[in-house]
Amino acid sequence: MTDLANQYARCQEIGGKVARLLARRSELAQTQFSQRLADATGRLVESDKPASASPAWATALDPWAGYRYAVDVAERSVLFWDTLRQRGNGFVEQARNGLRPVLHFGHELVIDGRKLARPVNYALVRLLPPDGVVIDVSKRPYVIIDPRAGHGPGIGGFKDDSQAGVALKAGHSVYFVIFFRDPEPGQTLLDVCAAEAQFVKKVCELHPDSPKPAIVGNCQGGWAAMMLASSDPDHTGPLVINGAPMSYWSGAWSEGEGDNPMRYSGGMLGGTWLASLTADLGNGKFDGAHLVQNFENLNPANSLWDKYYHLFDNADIEPPRFLDFERWWGGYYLMNREEIEWITRNLFVGNTLWSGEVRGLNGTAFDLREIKSPIILFASLGDNITPPQQAFNWVADIYGSTEEIKARGQVIVGLVHQSIGHLGIFVSGKVAKKEHQQIASVLEAIEAFPPGLYGMEIAERRGEDGETAYDVSFREYRLEEIAARLNRFERSDEQPFEAVKRVSELNQRAYELFLQPWVRMWSNETTANLQRQFHPLRAQRWALSDLNPWLAWLGPAAEAVRAKRHAEVHEETPLREFEHYGSEMFSASLDFYRAMRDAMTESAFFSFYGNLYTVERGEEAQARPAAAAGDPRDLPYVRDALASMTEGGYTEALARAACLLARRGEPLPLARLALRHELAKDYAAYLPQLPGDQWRRVRGEQEIIVRYEPEQALATLPHLLADPQDREKLLELAEKLLDDKRVQEAGPTAAQLSMLDKIRSSLPLERTPAVRTVGAMHEVPEAPAARVAPDLKEAS
């Protein structure tokens, strides 16, 4: 009886929280709607202020002005509908000739995945550089994996200012993982992962003298890249993961604003069974147009009005850009039933990709902790498809602490844009020239970072030539700090998703038992093709094309308009201002509808699944208590590191000295990283020649020792340098750095000078090098990234 009363009280509490949340969201939606109308009205009134004797409203009533505006509207209407006709013609032509990548660059086939032992509809192509661009084959190659989420490949190389364009301009060889419309029979996501591993190995073979290829994964391609790197860590270089939903249950919680409506979709639809039903209706193939429709439903104002009104308002100049983007947006690809079921069960609903439960073809689990290369995570606060929490929370899920990241030798760098939307992360030219270009410029430096969790910051400034320049810096963070900052409610909002998973499993099983046999019996290729052709997104394209005989007049009419376009009507007139005002009102109304829809969806989700979770778990469903603040020295990785304090040799001693001399809590500017790289080349003879992942593990272990037992770390340093030659070598390196003008210009801190004196005192020599009073061992360099030996870290 007590349990029942507790559950009832808990349900009442949930109901109260949901009601308050809905009220806040509704109030915010109303406020934003009212503000947009007020702003639009203010602009209209402002434009009404007379610049001459005649007020704007009087000008608007002038018959001649009305005639000119009517001509303008008529001409823009013809151009607008003709653009949609051209879009439809392009769609029909693509369907007839086969969908192709929308890559802006020429390309040549390297591997056709359809001819592999386990065939897949993927291929590896090499991008051809544009005229005037010279490729340096010794530079690190890039492999870009685009999302297979309904659309076709190529968005990462959509134009000059793109991820591919940035890498090509920098002289790198760029390879693209493309895919074809139809999946191979029986193809699975695990087959795709195995094929992508072969692609990367081929790139390594083609560039034997280059660093390991950088893998760039966009959205779905991001978690595909993570699977690839965890299954084959020896062939992958740095990973750049852009807007990838790695922890799908997580969500953003801005004050009173719903940022993540997509994460509720699986629960509101009852789980994974609907994806299976849709694939069965498609005769075993899932139509990617359904995924694109979900994206469009996220922002009805843009999908139904804004993008079309922008085309209508700028009918003279906008069509080329509109058609170029629609060529990608309107190309719909297919998946096998097995593929979409794997995605929904393991990612969208199951959220098990990070847990190690998912296994590859060889039976080995995809353990993301096995990734040896640095990982750069790029997300945006303006992304309502993959908010930063979904992009970053997996780090806290698989690493128990900052110490585990360091002990495993992992480098993880986070970069957050303040406003760009999901597609803008991959498509925006501004993002390509700023974020992606800067990421490409620092990959080699990031590879030589000591293990840990870093934030990357890009500051704009005006260069000496007047052009925009960027300053890049890094700052190290604690995992615990970042997890607390990102998750306001300590992730208690993720608990109802466990109930979603259980309901999904029940519904999936019920569908497979009672409905699936009947659906498969009645489905065939003819019915599947009919469904695809009459999907609303396809139908709206081919219906407005030359296939429609009622539009035969439109092409010639548009040509006539273009030939005698009335240029003077382009000017802003009062009637155009009224037009803009009406458009803004309609757009604001659609945004208000979206905000209320998302708020009610969120409330319904937590009302149902929150209570269901409470009933199922009982006392366990109470809010997660804050983790007890125990002694960090009790953590396994800390205990192991401290126990090995006196073990090791020159490599461990150099790493420990780097930790002892490191600057604490200061940003790490790019200029300092460049200095380290220069010093590494000049003093390579003093640096251990280790693979990068091995050095980072050594570096991480020594940093744990220095963090928790700094005095013992210094006192036991002589144990690591029992060999007099090693001791002399370390001190000789310090002397050479002292004499280096580049190091002297950097300037050590007082704390570093003091620590350097202590290190010297702890390492007496019979023949001691001349002692200086100026310390510069804080600039002990990084080894070249290809071999990656140490620097004495941020000692710079």
PLM feature spans:
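Conserved acidic catalytic loop of the alpha/beta-hydrolase fold
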Residues: 182-187, 194-213
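Gly/Ala-rich beta-loop-alpha elbow adjacent to hydrolase catalytic centers
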Residues: 216-225
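A catalytic-pocket lid/entrance helix-loop region that shapes and gates access to the active site
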Residues: 232-299, 404-406, 410-414, 423-443, ...
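Conserved alpha/beta-hydrolase "acid-adjacent" motif
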Residues: 385-390
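Small-residue-enriched hydrophobic alpha-helices in membranes
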Residues: 616-796
